[in-house]
Design a protein with these regions (language model features):
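Glycine-rich, histidine-containing beta strand-loop boundary motifs that form or position
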Residues: 1, 23-27, 135
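Short, small-residue-biased leader/transition segments that mark boundaries at the very start
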Residues: 2-7
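Short amphipathic alpha-helical segments and helix-helix/interface helices
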Residues: 10-14, 118-121
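Acidic, His- and aromatic-enriched active-site or binding-groove loops in soluble protein domains
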Residues: 11-36, 41-52
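Active-site and substrate-binding clefts of carbohydrate-active enzymes
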Residues: 37-48, 52-55, 67-70, 82-267
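Binuclear metal-dependent hydrolase catalytic cores centered on His/Asp/Glu-rich metal-binding motifs
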Residues: 61-75
Length: 267
């Protein structure tokens, strides 16, 4: 699964890495009239199957379960399985995907979320509904059609795009400054630099900077506002860049860096 189910047409690359399938969002602007309850394949590579998240049924658990103002509150396992049982019989694959932080963070344990999950298997069995892993679905179901994803897509907000990460000037400034030292980081062999580089690329660093309104309570980690997140990130990033430049000064031009990269690859 891509982080936050971000995807764009890159089927050949993913298939070349040995993957047989990809989990992604069942966004309306990509599906059009199609249903997310079938297996599809990537338009670039028919060998790469796509499993599309049913965002309503997924978000009913991960986002709305403990919301006392929700029209379906409180949600019981029997009701949830009745919704799934009501899906047309020919639509045999219903993908429920969510982050683990939905259990205990977005939905506190006091909401009885774990008891709800424990009750699901028995309620499903009583209605003739079975569970499968993504690999089992990919192995046992044929693709019904190709699906083209020409624009970046995610499972976040109504737009289902990447504007939550790169939609404002702060996010783009931080992103561009981070990757301005990418070539230098690639050629370094300092394990702490490599580790911090991975940390700095975490998608939540940029998501915490979003100024978009959200249909659910936006989790910002330790920050009170997107501006606090931006300020703290840029301070840390500035220190990181100084460390990188201490190893590979800015006056090393791209041609020299490329020569170093080529030398490393050939070793």
């Amino acid at each position: 699964r891509q982080r936050q189910m971000c995807i764009r047409d890159r089927g050949n690359m993913v298939a070349s890495m040995g993957f047989k399938g990809l989990l992604t969002e069942g966004a309306k602007h990509i599906l059009g009239w199609k249903s997310p309850h079938f297996v599809y394949h990537c338009s670039q590579n028919p060998n790469l199957k796509l499993l599309l998240r049913d965002y309503k049924l997924s978000d009913d658990i991960s986002l709305r379960f403990s919301n006392s103002t929700w029209s379906e509150f409180p949600l019981f396992a029997e009701t949830y399985m009745d919704w799934i049982a009501a899906v047309p019989e020919e639509e045999q694959v219903i993908n429920i995907f969510m982050e683990l932080c939905a259990l205990g963070m977005f939905q506190p344990l006091s909401s009885n979320i774990l008891e709800f999950l424990k009750a699901l298997p028995a309620c499903a069995k009583a209605r003739g509904i079975s569970f499968s892993t993504p690999s089992e679905v990919i192995d046992h179901h044929k693709s019904v059609d190709a699906l083209e994803v020409p624009y970046p897509m995610s499972w976040v907000d109504e737009e289902r795009d990447i504007s939550c990460w790169l939609g404002n000037g702060m996010q783009r400034e931080a992103f561009n400054k981070l990757y301005s030292v990418a070539d230098r980081v690639r050629i370094c062999n300092d394990s702490r630099i490599k580790q911090d580089w991975d940390y700095l690329q975490a998608s939540n660093n940029f998501r915490f900077m979003t100024t978009k309104s959200s249909s659910w309570n936006m989790y910002r980690g330790i920050y009170d506002s997107p501006y606090d997140a931006f300020t703290n990130y840029m301070n840390i990033l500035g220190d990181f860049i100084n460390r990188v430049n201490g190893m590979y000064p800015r006056d090393i031009d791209n041609e020299e860096l490329n020569s170093l990269l080529t030398l490393i690859k050939n070793q």
